UniProtKB/Swiss-Prot annotation:
Gene3D superfamilies: 4'-phosphopantetheinyl transferase domain. Its cofactor is Mg(2+). The keyword Cytoplasm applies. It comes from Burkholderia pseudomallei (strain 1106a). Keywords: Cytoplasm, Fatty acid biosynthesis, Fatty acid metabolism, Lipid biosynthesis, Lipid metabolism, Magnesium, Metal-binding, Transferase. It holds the Pfam family ACPS. GO terms for cellular component: cytoplasm. It catalyses: apo-[ACP] + CoA = holo-[ACP] + adenosine 3',5'-bisphosphate + H(+). It is an enzyme of class 2 (transferase). This is Holo-[acyl-carrier-protein] synthase.
């Protein structure tokens, strides 16, 4: 396995809060996958600030992932096709669905993700890995 790509994103939590307020909550429904949306609603019910911070980290994760795989937010990378969930230990991991999952599987691409938030910022770093020949082809290196 070799590095296929890296991506990072920094989201301003107050900006995410403003968009959420302006859209009456539709922004969360547009961006979050079903499992993420359940966690968002549960966290927001306990603490508005923690719910919005969660939304900001997940928005940031999708942006960083789209950069790591080199597609940006273009098909098959869609907002809801990628979810960042947490293991019981708290470790984040990504789960793709639909056409994005098929696209990643066809290339053997996997990813590692880390997310963090502090006051008004949420940051994500993603490392996408693929078999050596796939990563080499993307970088233009001879196989």
């Amino acid at each position: 396995m070799a590095i296929y790509g890296i991506g990072t994103d920094l989201a301003q939590v107050s900006r995410i809060a403003a968009v959420l307020e302006r859209t009456g909550g539709r922004f969360a429904e547009k961006v979050l996958g079903p499992d993420e949306l359940r966690v968002f609603h549960a966290r927001r019910a306990r603490s508005e600030a923690r719910g919005i911070a969660f939304l900001a980290t997940r928005f940031s994760a999708k942006e960083a992932f789209s950069k790591a795989i080199g597609l940006g937010m273009h098909w098959p990378m869609t907002w809801r096709a990628l979810q960042t969930l947490n293991r019981p230990s708290g470790e984040p991991y990504v789960v793709a669905s639909g056409e994005l999952a098929a696209w990643l599987d066809a290339r053997g691409i996997t990813a590692r993700v880390t997310v963090s938030d502090e006051r008004d910022y949420a940051v994500t770093f993603v490392v996408a890995e693929a078999p050596d020949h796939v990563a080499a082809a993307r970088s233009g290196a001879a196989s």
